[in-house]
């Protein structure tokens, strides 16, 4: 299944705010209308919608998300929390959380077009897994800096999560530590996502 490229507002109207996909928010009452539709949601549908939230927010294909779930399942600790940490530490998401891009798709374009360096080297893989002490910097070219400056100027300047530091005048950000799952930028029940996949096998 390919990455979603359809109408974004349609998705947030059904699933709620997906800040990684779009800065738009559902209209007041749209979630309420969904809740008032006839018929009780099945447990399967509830789990499916949580999975879809995760997939659309981070801009993943079905196969990519399944791969992350399997990696998380083999790691120590809570599978759901490890899954969120893996997704949050992706380079495209780190750029988004730093405010260097307005959405994760925009961050992915910056990486794909070789505007971003990690520890002094160009990285063109959006799924690159960032680690504590990594330094993310914009390439020292006017085009690269102009693109990121536009995003920085238009960002809402929300408080950065504790695992990140931004140096906007240097076009640079740093990863201080692995993210605490409480600081994830999406309202999600990750256990339902894990349950969804455990019932598919």
From Swiss-Prot:
<comment type="function">
    <text>With S5 and S12 plays an important role in translational accuracy.</text>
</comment>
<dbReference type="GO" id="GO:0042274">
    <property type="term" value="P:ribosomal small subunit biogenesis"/>
</dbReference>
<keyword id="KW-0689">Ribosomal protein</keyword>
<dbReference type="InterPro" id="IPR001912">
    <property type="entry name" value="Ribosomal_uS4_N"/>
</dbReference>
<dbReference type="Pfam" id="PF00163">
    <property type="entry name" value="Ribosomal_S4"/>
</dbReference>
<comment type="function">
    <text>One of the primary rRNA binding proteins, it binds directly to 16S rRNA where it nucleates assembly of the body of the 30S subunit.</text>
</comment>
<protein>
    <recommendedName>
        <fullName>Small ribosomal subunit protein uS4c</fullName>
    </recommendedName>
</protein>
<dbReference type="InterPro" id="IPR002942">
    <property type="entry name" value="S4_RNA-bd"/>
</dbReference>
<dbReference type="GO" id="GO:0006412">
    <property type="term" value="P:translation"/>
</dbReference>
<keyword id="KW-0150">Chloroplast</keyword>
<dbReference type="GO" id="GO:0003735">
    <property type="term" value="F:structural constituent of ribosome"/>
</dbReference>
<dbReference type="Pfam" id="PF01479">
    <property type="entry name" value="S4"/>
</dbReference>
<keyword id="KW-0687">Ribonucleoprotein</keyword>
<dbReference type="GO" id="GO:0015935">
    <property type="term" value="C:small ribosomal subunit"/>
</dbReference>
<dbReference type="InterPro" id="IPR022801">
    <property type="entry name" value="Ribosomal_uS4"/>
</dbReference>
<keyword id="KW-0694">RNA-binding</keyword>
<feature type="domain" description="S4 RNA-binding">
    <location>
        <begin position="89"/>
        <end position="151"/>
    </location>
</feature>
<dbReference type="GO" id="GO:0019843">
    <property type="term" value="F:rRNA binding"/>
</dbReference>
<feature type="region of interest" description="Disordered">
    <location>
        <begin position="23"/>
        <end position="42"/>
    </location>
</feature>
<keyword id="KW-0934">Plastid</keyword>
<dbReference type="InterPro" id="IPR005709">
    <property type="entry name" value="Ribosomal_uS4_bac-type"/>
</dbReference>
<keyword id="KW-0699">rRNA-binding</keyword>
<dbReference type="GO" id="GO:0009507">
    <property type="term" value="C:chloroplast"/>
</dbReference>
<dbReference type="InterPro" id="IPR018079">
    <property type="entry name" value="Ribosomal_uS4_CS"/>
</dbReference>
<dbReference type="InterPro" id="IPR036986">
    <property type="entry name" value="S4_RNA-bd_sf"/>
</dbReference>
<comment type="subunit">
    <text>Part of the 30S ribosomal subunit. Contacts protein S5. The interaction surface between S4 and S5 is involved in control of translational fidelity.</text>
</comment>
<comment type="similarity">
    <text>Belongs to the universal ribosomal protein uS4 family.</text>
</comment>
């Amino acid at each position: 299944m390919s990455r979603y490229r359809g109408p974004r507002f349609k998705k947030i109207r059904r699933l709620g705010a997906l800040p990684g996909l779009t800065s738009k928010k559902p209209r007041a009452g749209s979630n309420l209308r969904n809740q008032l539709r006839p018929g009780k949601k099945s447990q399967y549908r509830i789990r499916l919608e949580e999975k879809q939230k995760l997939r659309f927010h981070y801009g993943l294909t079905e196969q990519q998300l399944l791969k992350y779930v399997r990696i998380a399942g083999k790691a120590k600790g809570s599978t759901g929390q490890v899954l969120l940490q893996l997704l949050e530490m992706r380079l495209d998401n780190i750029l988004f959380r730093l405010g260097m891009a307005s959405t994760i798709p925009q961050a992915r374009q910056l990486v794909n077009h070789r505007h971003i360096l990690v520890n002094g080297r160009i990285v063109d893989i959006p799924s690159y897994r960032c680690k504590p002490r990594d330094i993310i910097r914009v390439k020292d070219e006017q085009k690269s800096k102009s693109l990121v400056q536009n995003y920085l100027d238009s960002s809402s300047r929300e408080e950065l999560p504790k695992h990140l530091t931004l140096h906007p005048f240097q076009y640079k950000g740093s990863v201080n530590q692995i993210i605490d799952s409480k600081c994830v930028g999406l309202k999600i029940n990750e256990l339902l996502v894990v349950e969804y996949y455990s019932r598919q096998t």
